[in-house]
From Swiss-Prot:
Disulfide bonds: none annotated. This is Co-chaperonin GroES. The keyword Chaperone applies. It holds the Pfam family Cpn10. Heptamer of 7 subunits arranged in a ring. Interacts with the chaperonin GroEL. Its main location: cytoplasm. The keyword Iron-sulfur does not apply. Keywords: Chaperone, Cytoplasm. InterPro entries: Chaperonin_GroES, Chaperonin_GroES_sf, Chaprnonin_Cpn10_CS, GroES-like_sf.
Length: 95
């Protein structure tokens, strides 16, 4: 199944968090926070939000940081994804 987000929404897939700390301590699943870094899977067309035209600044494949409590979690083909507004993306990771 493929998801096509509407308006200024973006579909992202969380990137896995480190399982060990810098000092070598292995973290159990219950102690790990959900990562705030993700890969963009799909991007909406943009549009008008609150009377302003929104240009999409991210594209599929970008790695991004996003706000901790933003978006809606969904499950598609046994894959956990998140749909959020472009405003909830804090920055694009450039390598």
């Amino acid at each position: 199944m493929k998801i096509r987000p509407l308006g200024d929404r973006v579909v992202i897939k969380r990137l896995e968090a480190e399982e060990t700390t810098k000092s070598g301590i292995v973290l159990p699943s219950s102690a790990k926070e959900k990562p705030q870094m993700a890969e963009v899977v799909a991007v909406g067309p943009g549009g008008v939000v609150d009377g302003k035209e929104i240009q999409m600044q991210v594209k599929t494949g970008d790695k991004v940081f996003f706000s901790k409590y933003s978006g809606t979690e969904i499950k598609v083909d046994n894959e956990e994804l998140l749909i959020l507004r472009q405003d909830d993306i804090l920055g694009i990771v450039e390598e």
